[in-house]
Each structure stands twice: as structure tokens, then as C-alpha cells.
Amino acid sequence: VFSRILRENAEKIGFTDSFTIYEPSDCKNLLKTIVRELNLPDEKYKPNVLSSRISYAKNCLVTPGAYLANSTCAAEDRQAQIPDNIYCQRCKRNGAMDFDDLLLQTNILLRDCPDVLARYQEQFQYILVDEYQDTNYAQYTIIRRLSQTHSKVCVVGDDAQSIYSFR
């Protein structure tokens, strides 16, 4: 659903409707390339670690600019933030989004474009979320935005199946 919403409104967030969705392997390959181009040590800047960090930030709705401006994040390894930022810039330049961008960009679109939000609030008067125990903050925020007008949301979940029980 979010991919369709983004394709229908891609120009409002600086993409074309033919944007590519990167697979996890594409993301890791891009990160490897960036680390190599920056001459960073492979053993310290592992694509899996960088990818997880980028994913976590996007799922918390933290954009690269906000991440760099955050004082808590600034206390972390500043050098690791450089490949993160370049990764996001390259994805945009390549007309691509990763799976986490689908959530982040949908949130940005609905937050910044009230006309788009109103349209989808009318279209999705009833919202059913299955496997709710596996939703993250970005997904919750989209659901909350879309349901503001009609407040007709049904969520189904099983805490015994939660993939986030370790958090």
C-alpha cells in the first residue's frame, strides 16, 4: 500500500513514479562501495552494521539531517555518520528507496502534504492491521495519521509471536 501511495505522489517528495526499491543486498553493496570510496577500514565499517543503523534511524523517523543534528547521535562515532548520509544521498540520486524508505517517505509525504493525507484518510476509512505486534514506530505513525478522521482501526496481534520481544 505504501509503495502505491508513494508512486502516486512521488514528485511531491522529489522522486519519480518509477523509483526502484532496493533489495537488502543492493543496500549492502552500495554501503560497501561507499566505505571503499571513503577509504574507511572494512573491519570497523561493516555493511551489516551500517545498514542496521540506517534502518533503525528510518524506522524511528529520523532523517539523515536530523540524525547528524542530534546531540546524542553526535556523541557517537561521527565518522560512521558519513557513510550513512552518503548512502541516503546516493539512493535519492539513483531514484531508489530501500524498504525502510517506504515507511519514512510515506510519513514525510503524509506529514508535509495535507491534501494527500486528506485523500487517503477518505480512501481508507477502515483500517485493519494484522500482525500488529510486529509494527514499528514508523508504521504506527502512518496508521495513526491515516485513521485520524474516522478512527476506525482494528489491530490483530499475538504477543507470543512478536519478533520484537527481545527489545
Can you annotate each of these PLM segments?
Residues 1-126, 150-151, 163:
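A basic/glycine-biased coupling hinge at the interface between accessory DNA-binding modules
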Residues 129, 133-167:
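Conserved helicase motor core of SF1/SF2 NTP-dependent helicases
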